Amino acid sequence: MKAFMDKEFMLQSPTAQHLYHAYAEDMPICDYHCHIPPREIYENRRFDNIAQVWLGGRNPDGSYFGDHYKWRVMRSNGVPEEYITGDKPDRERFQKFAEALPMAIGNPMYWTNLELHTFFGYDGVLNGDTAEEVWNLCNDKLQHDPKLTVRGLIEQSNVAFIGTTDDPIDSLEWHKKIKEDPTIKFTVAPSFRPDKALNINKPGFAEYMGKLAAAVGKEKLACINCVTSALTDRIEFFAEMGCRASDHGLDYIPYREATKEEVNAIYQKVMAGETCTPEEAEKYQTYILIHLGKQYHRLGIAMQIHYNCLRGVNRKMNTLLGPDTGYDMINTATCGGEIAALLSALNDTDECPKTIIYSLNPGDDAQIGTILGCFQNSEIPGKIQHGSAWWFNDHKIGMEEQMSRLASLGLLGNFVGMLTDSRSFLSYTRHDYFRRILCNLIGQWVEDGEYPNDEKALEKIVKGICFDNAKRYFNL
């Protein structure tokens, strides 16, 4: 019997073990998509206790922050909400999580133990009985160990690049301060997330467009030309601040062509307080997406598209706690044709940007895999990417399926690899988790005689997927 999470964790063959230890284990990390606050990096925040890091709490504006994965585990174990997002003492909240964790057999939440081993040197197993021991150990280190500040965690994880997620109206003041601080050796760059400027059919759109106008020094954005001009202005500002990628979180990918005059009329209608039809919303969104895609191409910014998430489906809890509190699910929208149409429209004028496509529904993997091959060109290997297994899929089965599907339909060797998509500074162990799964998958193919035992080729593939491909793709 293998020991729990030993040095050969998830590496089930001699070839897998060799590939991991020789080529994957010590590679730098390019965390090109995450949700960590740049302010906490600049201020080098030190956390008071492990519950703050893992379970989060409330922001000054009343919204919630924390790890949705852990919240869902606790809810699934019958833990009252007051211990999850409520105001119970942190020690009690941590106890409830520790008691729930043993029930998570087969769940990737067990990477919690990988975090304890990697950052705190704890080789035991967290459960209700060991919670006090772990609480005391972690809190002592968090409060006193210089390696366990925010920057210390990033540095000891060998992170070379962090791409945060930022709204177009953000001043990027913390990014500016990070760039000017010579003691910060890793790169932190903003990513352009213009969802609120596309959500013409959702509450708060007109108010947001007023904020976008203010961000570009205007009293208002009176027409669709004003909107595209403002977005271009902000993209260029982000590019000056080192932006390498955009990100679009869409319920589904729209594609409905319209003239500028039609789109302007739709925009004017909504800004006047009227409601647009779903078809009108799609016309506006398509027009803006095409404009943005052309700007990304011009500036060398990669376009990330995340879709097929149905958000806030528990109406009662969504009303009580707000969005992004763990009440989202996989959707079943079918929009492969629309993705292809969007890329084709951009390709017509040779303005299709580097694009990474993520669907929350793993049933879309084959369709995405076939889309990729339709729009590749000589600009860069793997210009159109199938994004890493996302959110509800970033576990062993999901990662193996995504990479196997990509290998079957495209070139796995050009894959840009893993990202944390996380709000936690302890989450860099997810890259290690991914690398072990990657090496085990490739190692098994070699062991089974499905790929030659070519050391040079295997080294290039493993190092590429772990870091080198992302380094090239994002111009690091």
Question: What residue ranges belong to the model's regions?
Answer:
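Metal-cofactor-binding active-site regions of metalloenzymes
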Residues: 2-299, 351-353, 357-369, 373-476
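Short secondary-structure transition/capping segments
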Residues: 43-44, 316-318
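C-terminal amphipathic alpha-helical interaction region
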Residues: 303-305
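Hard-cation-handling environments
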Residues: 309, 314
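Short glycine/proline- and charge-enriched loop/turn segments
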Residues: 318-326
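Divalent-cation-assisted or electrostatically stabilized phosphate/pyrophosphate-binding catalytic cores
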Residues: 332-339
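Short, basic/hydrophobic alpha-helical segments
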Residues: 342-348
